[in-house]
Every structure is written in structure tokens, then in C-alpha cells.
Design a protein with these regions (language model features):
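Peripheral, non-transmembrane regulatory/ligand-interaction domains of membrane transport proteins
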Residues: 1-171
Length: 171
């Protein structure tokens, strides 16, 4: 899925076509969508699709005419009917006329921007947008770590008494 946004007077608008200063958000894009964006912006297809590989490591690379930023962001996952915490790659491609984000799944971090919850968010101020995304990611990491630590303390208190196999597995 490819969605195009642009802020005008601090309001995030959905666009039907690509314009200067826009944000192109790609969530689990098809190969055709990847090809179209790669061709339109003269980006190597591998640079866009690298964010879809869960094993891809974080990096920043300066390419000819664009910058690729790949970071792991936190995302919730349900396994065995329990909420778990994991990370997935988020690709951010910076071009002079647009910013492109690529992710395998729809994440709370990107949705925070789509819902226009960030103060002074502008798709035209690309570096600020990147900093805001990284800050939001760090904020979610911290919130998740607090929840994990709280759960760890609860389990440790239970383990002090009778220890069962499920307590050890949870820990």
C-alpha cells in the first residue's frame, strides 16, 4: 500500500499524486509499487526493498541523489496469545523533493504521524521529520522497556514463593 501525504498550514493532507514536499508512506508494498517509486525517484530497488527484510541491519548510506536510513523500530506482536515486543526495519529515503518511508507492517510509530499527532510536523521539513520519527521510536522503546520491567518485577515476586514452569518461561 502506498499513501502520499503533504502538510499545508500544519494540516496533513492525503494526495492522489506526488508533489514536492510530500511524504510517501509505503506499507508492505507490492513489487509493482516498489518498481514505480524506484523508477519515479531514480532509486535502486534494493534500497527501497531492504526495509522489507526483517534481518536487515540498521545503517545510513549516502547514495547518488538520495540518502537511505534504515532503523529498527519497536512494534507489538502477539505470540501464543501474549503480547510480545519485537523490532522491525523502517526504511527512510530522503530525496530533495520527497521523503519516503518503507515498512513491512503498519506500525504505531508511523500511524502517530498519519493521525497528525506530532506538534509542528511538516513533510516539507525533512530533517525535522526524520528527527521526530527517531524520537517517537525512542519514546516507544522506553515505554516498552518500562512495561517489560514492570512485568519482570511481578514475575520475580511470584517466583519468590512457589516457582512453576510457566513462571520461568514468562521470565
Amino acid at each position: 500500500m502506498v499513501e502520499i501525504y503533504r502538510t499545508d498550514q500544519q494540516v496533513l493532507n492525503t494526495l492522489t499524486d506526488i508533489q514536492d514536499g510530500c511524504w510517501i508512506n509505503m506499507v508492505d508494498p507490492t513489487s509493482k509499487e516498489l518498481e514505480q517509486i524506484a523508477e519515479r525517484f531514480e532509486i535502486e530497488p534494493e534500497d527501497i526493498s531492504s526495509a522489507l527484510d526483517e534481518e536487515e541491519s540498521s545503517r545510513i548510506s549516502l547514495e547518488d541523489g538520495y540518502t537511505v536510513i534504515l532503523v529498527d523500530i519497536p512494534t507489538p506482536e502477539v505470540r501464543h496469545e501474549k503480547k510480545m515486543y519485537t523490532t522491525i526495519p523502517l526504511g527512510i529515503i530522503l530525496k530533495s523533493e520527497a521523503i519516503i518511508t518503507v515498512c513491512k507492517v503498519d506500525t504505531p510509530i508511523i500511524n502517530y504521524f498519519v493521525r497528525n499527532k506530532v506538534k509542528e510536523f511538516s513533510t516539507k521539513k525533512k530533517m525535522r521529520f526524520i528527527y521526530q520519527m527517531l524520537f517517537r521510536s525512542a519514546f516507544v522503546y522506553q515505554a516498552n522497556l518500562r512495561l517489560i520491567d514492570k512485568k519482570r518485577i511481578e514475575i520475580e515476586e511470584r517466583v519468590d514463593g512457589d516457582t512453576s514452569d510457566t513462571d520461568l518461561i514468562e521470565l
